[in-house]
Amino acid sequence: MILNVLFILVGIVLVLWGADRLTDGAVAVAEKLKMPQIVIGLTIVAMGTSMPEFCVSLVSALKGTTDLAVGNIVGSNIFNTLLIVGVSAWVAPMTILKSTVRKDIPFALFASVILLIMCLDGNISRLDAGILFVLFLVFMYVTLKGAKTKEDDTTAKTEPIEDKKKPMAAWLSIVWIIVGLACLIGGSNLFVEGATKVAEHIGVSEAVIGLTIVAGGTSLPELATSVVSARKGNSGIAIGNVLGSNVFNILAILGVTGVITPMHLQGITMLDLSMMVVSTLLVWLFSFTKYKIARWEGIVLTIVFIGYMVVLCY
């Protein structure tokens, strides 16, 4: 039991550190290839923050623990919308960008509803996964197109600012990519192995472990970043990133994972999937009050999360 808990702890550290190193290396390569900053931010950096969820879910599915794979995604999305947004609003009221209310939250809600409908038969087939991934490509196209337009408008009105940051050496960026991938793969295997054994030892389902321990572990960076952003008054960007992560989790991660290996669900219930939908809907409703999420609304989100955890574990 102690060894398996150690596997979980070491695994999550390797996964998180590996994702960070992989992202640094990939960004450095992209900059050397003269990719626009907006494209780097919306693709490499955004995907890098979701690499822990992706690797853990993919490894879980390949090992046959599909409840752990799907539970990780569903649990991460619930964790993001209820706990991260809730705690961040508790720290400081969150100002929501209009684009987030009009585009990001509705699309996250749409993705959640689509996943719920697909899971009604207890399976995520290759066809289901293919549809999810096509929707992800549509989302990325619309997002990049909109962001590029905004960037063109901004650069037309402002003077270029010289970037004084020293670029990473080419050899070092390649090293970080290789090291990051190795840590992600090794850490994911350790994490999944430890989580599976702990579930067997304490007599709970893999789905519960995925919805709680695994989801919480892979979402810790978003929690820390969002709370710090809220304290610094940058909550609008933080909540947009959290919701963007939710869309990526469902459409890209489950899309790719499901195409590689179809997933049969046993422990993931309609309660879990419905909570994912309801949590997104709550954030959307709260955001209409002057485009802010007040402290009391953050407390409500946090209480709902705690209540869900209690029901899930007992």
Which sequence ranges carry the predicted segments?
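Hydrophobic alpha-helical segments, chiefly the membrane-spanning helices
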Residues: M1-Y314
